[in-house]
Amino acid sequence: MIPVINKRDTGLNICRLMDKYKLTVRDVQKYLELGSQQSIYHWLNGISMPTIDNLYVLSYLFGVTIDDIVCGNRPEYIIKIFIVNHIG
């Protein structure tokens, strides 16, 4: 199986990180210097993915690696999602 990125889980992960640091969509928009909030809502809802540049900035904002933000179907991602969702 070819590894693929799961946009929905990645969006949920971004949402979780925003909640952890008590950041609003507006806060992230300002930090990324985006013209509107629509892109961020698309990420959070799994409609689209942040660009690699935005992922890089988000990783800095949240103090994590890009791999910690992006979720896919590789076994280590599936285990990580289970742990976050069920164990905390």
Label every PLM stretch briefly:
Residues M1-L23, Y31:
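A short, Lys/Arg-rich alpha-helix, primarily the initiator
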Residues M1-V4, Y60, V70-G88:
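Short, charged recognition helix plus adjacent turn
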Residues I14, V28-Q29, I40-W43, I69:
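Conserved hydrophobic/aromatic packing and binding residues within compact polymer-binding modules
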Residues V25, Q37, I52-L55:
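Helix-turn-helix DNA-binding elements, focusing on the entry/boundary residues of the two helices
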Residues D27-K30, L58:
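Short alpha-helical "recognition helix" segments of helix-turn-helix
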Residues L34-P50, C71-G72:
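Recognition helix of helix-turn-helix/homeodomain-like DNA-binding domains
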Residues D53-D68:
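DNA major-groove recognition helix of helix-turn-helix/homeodomain DNA-binding modules
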